[in-house]
C-alpha cells in the first residue's frame, strides 16, 4: 500500500472516531445503555437480514463487473466479483473520492487476467450506472416521499441538493471518459509529462507509444458496447439491486428493533437522501456529513432516539460494509498469492 493510501486510511480512522464522538457527545438523548438495550432486544432474524443486505451491497457491484468482463470475452466468477466489489467499497470509504476504489478493483481484475483497458471500460460503465441508479431511486423518493425531504433542516437539504448536482456532473464526466478515449489519453499523457519533468520516470516516449496502443484497444472495447442495450439494462439492474441492498440495511434494523413497516420504509427513503447528500464533500466515506444528514432525518421518525438509531444504522451500512470488504479483500489477496506461487 503506498503512502497516499496509508495516509487516507489513518485519516479515515481518525474522522470515524471523531464522527462517532461528535454524535455521542452532542446528543443530550444518547445513552450507551439504551443503545446496547436496542441490540440485545432486537430480533436476531432481522439483524441477520441487515447483514445479508450489507453483503449484497458488495456482491451486486462485483457481479455487474463480472457480467461485463464476460461480455468482453474474459472468464471470471461471481466469487471473483465479490473481491472486485469489496475492493471498491473498502477503498472508496478510506479515500476522499467516491471513485477511489476503482484502481483497487482494477488491480484484482488485472490479476485475474482481464486486460487493463477492458477493466477500465467495465469500471467506467459501472460508475455511470452506479450514479444513475442512485439518481433514479432518489428521484422516485423525492416524488413519492417529498414530505420527508421537506422536513430536513435547511443545511441538510443544501447537502442533498448539492450532492445531486455532483452526481449528475460525475455521471457526465464518466460517460465522456468512456466514449471519448482522447480525453483519457490527454490526461494520461499530461501525467507522463509531469512525471518526466520531476524526474520520476525516464523514457517517456516509450510510455507514450505503449499508451497509444493501449488506448486504441480501450476505444475498441468501449465501442463494443454501442448498441448493446440489453447488456446496459442488465448492468443498470444490478446497480439498482446494489443500491436497494444498501437502503434495505436500515429497513431491516428498524424492523429488528420493532419500529414497524411504515417507519422502516421511511428510513430507507432517508437513507437514499443521505447517500445523495454524502457526495457533496470530498471526505472519506462522507463521515461527519452523512452522520449529520442521517440524524437530522431520523429525528422525523424516532425523535430523541435519533442518535442511538443513527449509530446502529450507520454502523451496519457504512462501518459494517467496510469491515466486511476488508475481510473479503484480505482473503482474495491471500488466495491469489497462493495461486501465483
Question: Which positions does each model-derived feature cover?
Answer:
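Membrane-embedded helical hairpins/re-entrant loop segments and their flanking transmembrane helices
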Residues: 60-86, 90, 253-270, 294
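Hydrophobic faces of transmembrane alpha-helices in multi-pass small-molecule transporters and flippases
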Residues: 47-51, 86-94, 124, 232-240
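A short amphipathic helical element positioned immediately N-terminal to and/or at the very start
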Residues: 33-41, 214-226
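Membrane-interface helix starts
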Residues: 6-7, 41-50, 223-237
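Alpha-helical transmembrane segments of multi-pass membrane proteins
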Residues: 79-88, 118, 265-276, 305-315
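Transmembrane helical segments that form the transport core of multi-pass membrane transport proteins
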Residues: 224-273
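Transmembrane helix-loop-helix hairpins in multi-pass inner-membrane proteins
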Residues: 1-37, 91-201, 283, 287-341
